[in-house]
């Protein structure tokens, strides 16, 4: 019973928190999604057999 008031207060605080829909941005106001897209395309390029044949982090050529 001692935890019930604390639980109610925490529930009210989390309900009034910021929305999850907010888009993450850097300090320069560039969306972080563009950085994620760049990282994904770089990884895709590195995993291409023709571009990374012989590197340890890539799939061996075959």
UniProtKB/Swiss-Prot annotation:
Signal peptide start-end: 1-22
Disulfide bonds: 52-58, 53-61
Cell location: Secreted
Keywords: Acetylcholine receptor inhibiting toxin, Amidation, Disulfide bond, Hydroxylation, Neurotoxin, Postsynaptic neurotoxin, Secreted, Signal, Toxin
Expression across tissues: Expressed by the venom duct.
Positions of post-translational 4-hydroxyproline modification: 60
Cross-referenced InterPro entries: T-conotoxin
GO molecular function per UniProt: acetylcholine receptor inhibitor activity; toxin activity
Modification Cysteine amide, positions: 61
Record-level GO cellular component terms: extracellular region; host cell postsynaptic membrane
Highest rank taxon of the organism: Eukaryota
Propeptide, chain numbering: 23-47
Similarity remark: Belongs to the conotoxin A superfamily.
Domain writeup: The cysteine framework is I (CC-C-C). Alpha4/2 pattern.
Protein's name in the database: Conotoxin TxIC
């Amino acid at each position: 019973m001692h935890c019930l008031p604390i639980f109610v207060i925490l529930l009210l605080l989390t309900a009034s928190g910021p929305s999850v829909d907010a888009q993450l941005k850097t300090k320069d106001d560039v969306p972080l999604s563009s950085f994620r897209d760049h990282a994904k395309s770089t990884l895709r390029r590195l995993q291409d057999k023709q571009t990374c044949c012989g590197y340890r982090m890539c799939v061996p050529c075959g």
